Amino acid sequence: MLKAGINTPQPATPVYRAGRFYQLEMPFIEGATAYDLLKSELPVSQDLLYELARGLGKIVGRIARAGLRHRDLKLENVVVKASSQEATPLSLWLIDPVGIRSSYSLTDSLVCMLDRLAIQPLNDGLAVPLSLQIICIQSALGQLSGIQRRHFFQLLRKSLLDSRFRAHQI
């Protein structure tokens, strides 16, 4: 994760071991989760939300470009660390690196993680503005080639149709 340029707490100490599995204690990262900022009823500046969407997209893009995929990326697992100066960019921390797996397809990885980010607000009835969704997707895509971009949007469209179909079945 560090090689990919993603802020994530480093495990402090092993707490428990069961066979080949370890439970590690992670340091506490102070701040609000991305989800808390989106659902906050307090007035939050649009610039802050745009920067948050851009930062989330960068995290998704960096994970995917590193040949990885976070199989359970949620807005609750990204902490926005408070900054003392207004001019400094937001510091986003991925606090749940447990779901990281290898991925052989950049576009599959991007779609999977963006889809996972969208599920929680949808399930809670939180309307995320389209502008924030677009900023997040653009930031995640970065400099993809035209062919990869086309493939990405085909997969994303299929994913959206599948999720709508599943929602109607319930």
Regions found by a protein language model. Give the residues of each.
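Conserved ATP-binding subdomain of kinase catalytic cores across diverse folds
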Residues: 1-34, 61-66, 170
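Conserved kinase catalytic-core helix
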Residues: 2-8, 37-71, 76
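Active-site-proximal flexible loops/turns
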Residues: 17, 34, 79-84, 103-105
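A glycine-centered beta->alpha junction motif in the catalytic cores
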Residues: 28-44, 99-100
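Conserved protein kinase catalytic/activation segment
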Residues: 77-94
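C-lobe/activation-segment region of protein kinase-like
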Residues: 90-166
